[in-house]
Amino acid sequence: MTKTIYKPWGKEVWLELNDKYCYKRIYINAGNKTSYQYHHHKLETNYLIEGTAEVWLENDDGVVDKKMMNPGDFFTIEPPKKHRVIAITDIILQEVSTPEVNDVVRIEDDSNRSDGKIEHEHARPVLCILTAGLGKRMGGLCSHINKGLLPLDNKALISHLIDKTSKDYEIVVALGYKGEMVKEYCEAAHPDRKFIFVNVDNYEGPGSGPAYSISQCKEHLQRPFVWAVADTIITNPLPPLETDWLGLYPTDIPELYSTADVEDDVIVNFKDKSKDGYNYAFIGIAGVYDYSTFWKEINVSSGEIVSAYYNINNYSHIKAKYFDWYDAGTIDNYLKAQKGVGKTKQYSIPKTNGEFLYKIDSTFIKLSSNKSFISGRIARAKQLEGLCPPLSYKGNNVYSYQWIAGKTLYECNDPKIWKDFLSFAQTHMWSKEPHPMQEPCVKFYKDKTHDRLKLFLSRRDSSYQEAHTINGVKTPPIKKLLKVLEKEDLYTGIPTKLFHGDLQFDNIVYGDDKSFYLIDWREDFGGGEIGDVCYDLAKMYGGILMSYSHMREQENFSCICSGQEVFFKYSTEPSLKGFVNFYENWLKSNNFNVSKIKTLTALIFLNMAPLHEKEFGDLLFFQSKLMLSSIE
């Protein structure tokens, strides 16, 4: 089993160590050098695989020769001859030696290391992410979620930090506000990483702050480590952990940031939020090589982790490392980061109800602040086994599954495949169950509609309760239109366990294997596990009338309200327009009540309205009114 040893100048990868020999690969970063050293007993031969190096080696006369070496060159070091390797470029050495690996006497060392084995070099390096805070600067964005979980380029902010470290690093995460969500996300998104989760007992109020949070992690940070706040986003690689360093970015407003004075890439002074500060802002990420000094210097009672750097001269030296940086810690800066860090692909229409989607490599993750929502989804995944992908992670706030290779039915944009799915659904879904439907249908269609309408109107002015002219069509007030809820046939559902609950074309995948898969299924129907086939049919009808894949992007729709005059429009695919008549005829030919399906579709649009951002929510509301007014 290989072992990686991190050095101030790079790293060693030990491929074999036994009682006869040691075999290793040595990686030295350009411009760095090993100790000037000798061995009492160890005999070694080094072969230069890659790069250019200057090798110092004492000869038999006691003179240290200095020689440039290139790939293919090799040298043997006999004890007790002095030697050193200087990397002109990045180099890779292959070393075979006798097994006395701790036999080293350091005459001169840039990091002032002592002789023999350096214990912390043999410990795994670690990244510590501070996520405990409330995220107050993020306003309503953090009402449902920890700020470290806000999505950016389809993954959480903290994933951008985790992905900057090699798999050798352990990840220590300081948990506080919505900490269980953070823990579950990390486990689902990065199952191949070693995490240590630390619950911070005070993350709000007096005494709390980044300094206190990291102090709670101290027992796990008795070795060189990198620490970062959760809302720091960098686009360039992390530097090697070979010295103390601070991450910097140019600034002309030092009163807003801790700032550093830099000479020859070494930090010589440090100030916290002062108009007399310097030209480089500290960005909330740092490498701590001299961890003993860090723990001596930090003033936990101040709450400020930067207090560890107020007495900068107490460190041997701290290097300046410059990053391309986004501060995602305020609403404005988070929105800037969304524009600057890749193009986030919307996998669904944005919601405001605490649901979040992520895609990390081939893993698709659903997170919700509503635990019953997640537990219901997990339970129904078992019922839909064979129709939906198997879950790879099941938590209280998170579940995940492996991404299915294929296209959604919207992406297929092929009426033949859509027709094939209708045949598939009739064969593999909707098997009837003997179950009374009156009560669950009343709860789901009537009671939920009244609750959702109340929620929607609570966020709008009183004009939304009045009559409107919508796209030139006069419609009565919404409460008058909802007399449709008095129709008894609305509550005579077709019971089935094998319902989806959100059966629109974005939630149906046509796999590369020519099979159909259901994703993003509903957790229940009226609080129970038996659903109504008519609801699936109405959901599908709504997604045919309005392409939800288009609705992910705001430029594809508009809704203008001027008093009681309303005009809305949205784009769709010509193929969907042509499919409407086929679908309605298919419903009739299979003895489904088309008028009922249309009524349920109108109610679906109304129920969706309060769950989405304002303009799209308005569009859904007025689309519902328009449909309800046309139903006989």
Per-range role (PLM):
Residues 5-6, 86-123:
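Double-stranded beta-helix
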Residues 106, 118-127, 279-353, 359:
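Conserved alpha/beta core of the MobA/IspD/sugar-nucleotide pyrophosphorylase nucleotidyltransferase superfamily
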Residues 120-143:
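N-terminal nucleotide-binding beta1-loop-alpha1 segment
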Residues 187-259:
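Conserved beta-loop-beta/alpha segment of the NTase-like Rossmann-fold superfamily
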Residues 233-306, 311:
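Conserved core of the sugar-phosphate nucleotidyltransferase
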Residues 349-378, 402-403, 409-412:
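ATP-binding glycine-rich loop module of kinase domains
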Residues 382-387, 407-492, 499:
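Conserved kinase catalytic-core helix
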Residues 524-585, 602-616:
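Active-site activation/catalytic loop segments of kinase-like enzymes and analogous catalytic loops
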